[in-house]
Amino acid sequence: MLVAALGVLLYRDYVREADEPEPLAPAAAAPTEDDARREGFERAYARGQWGRNKQGKGSSGAGSTLESTRVYRVFLQDFLAAHEIRSVVDAGCGDWEFSRAMDWTGIDYLGLDIVAPVIEANRRRYGAANVRFAVADIVRDDLPPADLLLVKDVLQHLSHADIARVLAKLPRYRHVLIVNDVQQDSLSAAYQDIPTGGYRPLDLTQPPYSLRGAKVLAYRLGTNTKLVLHLQGDGGRAGGNGR
């Protein structure tokens, strides 16, 4: 009898446990805006959205080749010397296709990019005592101090909200050089908003931004013009160079 009763109890426990639902796995966290921004740029490189290099891997695009940056590189090299630049933060350094041809002697260079594999490759190929690379989201993260902040071909891929967050960080820099595509005919652009990771020409001297920095260089590339804007002193927000 005791054995039979024990068997009944064990059976009841088994049935009760079998009837209980399995605990649900914790729901995956919804992707944040920061996640979406990183994933957008990672996809661009993975798919070769902006072009591919000689090895067939996604690259920073036609605007970053040695040939297409010849005029810009001459300008930038002269700018570094003329303004006695000793430190540079390159916000959105990309795959360093053209920057490797620059002379960074005597300059502490830090290249930042949101795509980790790009930064890892740059470290292996180009890292030196005065040339460093780090993974960073220039929209979200604080940017290190430097004599010069470079922002080349980056803001044209950001939403208006993300552009505003980057521009808010400029006042700390003595010099800022911003490069974007603008329309050839008027050096202005359509200002529709885009999701970050997309693209549109962008002239920051036009509304809604109306930055009053100096237009120090303009050169043709394909169907667009590259415009280099120099913001000085307080990031271009006062003293005749501001918004």
Could you describe each region identified by the protein language model?
Residues V15-V89, G94-A146, A161-R243:
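Class I (Rossmann-like) S-adenosyl-L-methionine-dependent methyltransferase catalytic domain
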Residues R12:
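A glycosyltransferase accessory/donor-loop signature
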Residues L148-A161:
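A short SAM/SAH-binding and catalytic strip from SAM-dependent methyltransferases
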Residues M1-L9:
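Hydrophobic membrane-insertion alpha-helices, especially the h-region
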